[in-house]
């Protein structure tokens, strides 16, 4: 930083007894430059909201396909257990072995 004095050293007016002048003397300095950096700012952005909607659906029936009458397939009566699977003809578990009902709750496979 450089400074200079604009004060005049030439006598002003009649020669005084003291070495002084009636004009003000100001010390002037060059302008300064300051770089002010703002402090860091933390911004929190919300993350995605992950939702899961598990859907498990069971389709089937535990009731007989024939309501109010007796149903038979090949002279074999079909009960409640046999109504699931192969179109309600007393066969269940297609691909896992065929099972049906004989008479009153007797199951054959």
From Swiss-Prot:
Any one GO CC term of the record: intermediate filament
**Which UniProt keywords are listed?**
Acetylation, Keratin
Q: Which GO terms describe its molecular function?
A: structural constituent of cytoskeleton
Record flagged with keyword Acetylation:
yes
Record has Acetylation as a keyword: yes
- Coiled-coil stretches noted in the UniProt entry, renumbered to this chain: none
Positions carrying N-acetylserine are 2
**Record-linked Pfam families:** Keratin
Per the record, the similarity remark reads: Belongs to the avian keratin family.
Recorded protein name is: Beta-keratin-related protein
**Organism in which the protein naturally occurs:** Coturnix japonica (Japanese quail)
Starting at the broadest rank, the lineage of the source organism is:
Eukaryota, Metazoa, Chordata, Craniata, Vertebrata
């Amino acid at each position: 930083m450089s400074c200079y004095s604009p004060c005049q050293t030439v006598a002003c007016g009649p020669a005084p007894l003291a070495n002084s002048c009636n004009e003000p003397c100001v010390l002037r300095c060059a302008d300064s430059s300051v770089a002010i950096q703002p402090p860091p700012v933390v911004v929190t952005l919300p993350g995605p909201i992950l939702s899961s909607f598990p859907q498990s659906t069971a389709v089937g029936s535990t009731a007989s396909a024939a309501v109010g009458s007796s149903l038979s397939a090949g002279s074999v009566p079909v009960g409640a257990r046999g109504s699931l699977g192969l179109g309600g003809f007393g066969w269940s578990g297609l691909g896992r072995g065929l099972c049906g009902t004989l008479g009153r709750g007797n199951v054959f496979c």
